[in-house]
Amino acid sequence: MNGGRLPLLVIVSGAPGAGKTTLGRTIASRLALPFLSKDELKEAIGEKVGTPADVPASQRLGLAAYSVLFGMATRILEAGGGAVVESNFRRGQSEPELRFIVALADARLVHCSAAPPTVMRRYAERYQRGDRHPVHLDAQRAGALADDLASGRFEPLDLEVPTLVVATDDGYAPHLDEVVEFLRAEAGVGGGPILVAQS
């Protein structure tokens, strides 16, 4: 660790199709941090064990990917390194595991937000184009996504860390440079102000 300071942990959250992976990878590049994506880990596992036969099997692969993600993040943070972790973490469900790694770090949450019609359109377009790995079975899960959006499961996580909500409907609001500045700000700003971009 640098001067006794905790390492930086950036958690990138939001619904499928909200732009998390693109933003998370860009943040990791700008901050020179490793990028840990649950979906990328799930795809790597799927390449070895095969495409799941149904949604429950796909979900089991997702749980395995989460185990790898949290294990890798823990090792990196315990060694004093920072990381960017990205997934469609669910409010009211994902917080317990995240709090374990948050306790090891100077953690910040970047939550990607887009209007539900935008999310559903992007979600459909990417699997129709064949952009998504078959391990995700996206075509079979569109109905579940609509339900999750309506339920609020993809609202910002309850982690009591500094939180920035980034609107991704048309580019980034706030802009990328402002997002990076938020992440580079000094630690010790208190527990979890939620900053929402005004359009």
Regions found by a protein language model. Name each.
Residues 103-124:
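Conserved phosphate-donor/acceptor-positioning beta-strand/loop module used by diverse small-molecule
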Residues 12:
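Hydrophobic anchor at the beta1->P-loop junction of P-loop NTPases
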Residues 19:
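Conserved glycine(s) of the Walker
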Residues 22-79:
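Conserved substrate/cofactor phosphate-moiety recognition/catalytic segment
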Residues 16:
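The conserved Walker
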Residues 61-106:
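Glycine-rich phosphate-binding loop used to anchor ATP phosphates in small-molecule kinases
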Residues 128-176, 197-199:
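Small-molecule kinase domains that catalyze NTP-dependent phosphoryl transfer to phosphate-bearing small molecules
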Residues 5-9, 81:
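Pre-Walker A (Motif I) flank of P-loop NTPase domains
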